[in-house]
Amino acid sequence: AMEEDYSSNLNLDNINKILGVSISKDQYENNEVAGVVTGLAWTQFGGDILFIESALSKGKGNLSITGNLGKVMKESATIALEFIKSNSDDLSIKLETLTKHNIHIHVPEGATPKDGPSAGITMLTSLVSLFTQKRVKSKLAMTGEITLRGKVLPVGGIKEKILAAKRAKIR
């Protein structure tokens, strides 16, 4: 392979030439559709935003969860779905929709491991949005653990998450 020579001085003028154009995930191109919701996450490098996508397909009510998620995050998805099943009448969701369709929840950037309870409210909102076909504003982001009774519990990393929201121009 051919090597290119670069100046050893890194500055704003040559950083893109050396490293390439930065990849920004501060915005999601198809975020204003039912079932797609913005969440806030804590990482070892600070706060970040993530997107939860939900989809339905014909089936028997099976739940699939993808995106390199850990055990706690998968449990949050199960809790979200069980809350919806228990409260389908109050949410104006037909129970038939839940039993005659498979539900898929995906958190993009599958190469990045993700875990923790704080995406629970985002998963719940994504599913309710999908089932009711009501879109969630793209400039709305959320974080919080949910319980089977629908309570939102406090989570950590709030300062970092707020800074991530600000970087993503979420008010």
Language model region names:
Residues 4-15, 19-38, 44-171:
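Peripheral, non-AAA+ core regions of ATP-driven protein-machinery
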